[in-house]
Amino acid sequence: MPNRTVFFVSDGTGITAETFGNSILAQFSAKPRHVRRPFIDTPDKAYQVVREINDTAGREGKRPIVFITLIDTEVRGIIRSAHCLVLDMLGTFVEPLEAEFGIKSNHRVGRFDDISKSQEYTDRIEAINFSLAHDDGQSSKNLDIADVILVGVSRSGKTPTSLYLAMQHGIKAANYPLIPEDFDRGALPSALVPHKKKCFGLTIAPERLREIRHERRPNSKYASLENCRLEVSAAESMMGREGIAWLSSTHKSIEEIATTILRDIRPDRLIY
């Protein structure tokens, strides 16, 4: 898909269109150029986007791919007139559901107007604040209210997973590094012992860990393959002895890791 452009056109922020589009584009190995065009909510704005799409088609010699989330039928029709392949999330999914349910959808742009008043929003903000305060073992206070405590060697994916769980699912996720001193003692950090049942481990292939650490501290003992192998082996042995469930982050996305953790610790969050 070289020299190909993908547009994400929305009458809101464009986040839904982009998320929808990227989930489909992820099935293909090529990486096209991305263009987001949010707040396209009038015919004049739509015609401007059409000109941009047509100019792109002429320049590249291939029609662009256009993902749209547009409520207004006139605006949708204008975008559809462009020289492009239109993939319409609302037309593809919402309209068939209207027919199936026998009711019209609300057709409200984005539906974010009252999100700040919702309990879900409040829970997510609290979870984000908790995860930031308990990142990388910064604090051992209030671990009793954590939903999960991620443990593992440094750079195994604990921080991004913690923040994803907080932002997407309202999970209070702390994370705590397992370091050489812990391996020398052969025991979990003392702060984690009372909360062992809340711990979930992340491990990683030593070769991949070396690559990540080398970017941070090149040519150091910390990043050496031998040290990475020793730390990973010691961490996995410790988690096994302590009965802590764990998974490898080597070939998994943050979304896959988070979903696996949710399935194990909070399956209720998969139903809402």
Swiss-Prot record:
- Describe the function of this protein: Bifunctional serine/threonine kinase and phosphorylase involved in the regulation of the phosphoenolpyruvate synthase (PEPS) by catalyzing its phosphorylation/dephosphorylation.
Catalytic activity reads: [pyruvate, water dikinase] + ADP = [pyruvate, water dikinase]-phosphate + AMP + H(+); [pyruvate, water dikinase]-phosphate + phosphate + H(+) = [pyruvate, water dikinase] + diphosphate
Which InterPro entries does this chain map to?
Kinase-pyrophosphorylase, PSRP
Q: Which domain of life is it from?
A: Bacteria
Supply the name of the protein. Putative phosphoenolpyruvate synthase regulatory protein
State the HAMAP family in the record: PSRP
The text of the family note is: Belongs to the pyruvate, phosphate/water dikinase regulatory protein family. PSRP subfamily.
Q: What is its EC number?
A: 2.7.11.33, 2.7.4.28
- GO MF, one annotated term: protein serine/threonine kinase activity
Key words, A-Z: Kinase, Nucleotide-binding, Serine/threonine-protein kinase, Transferase
Q: Where does ADP bind?
A: 152-159
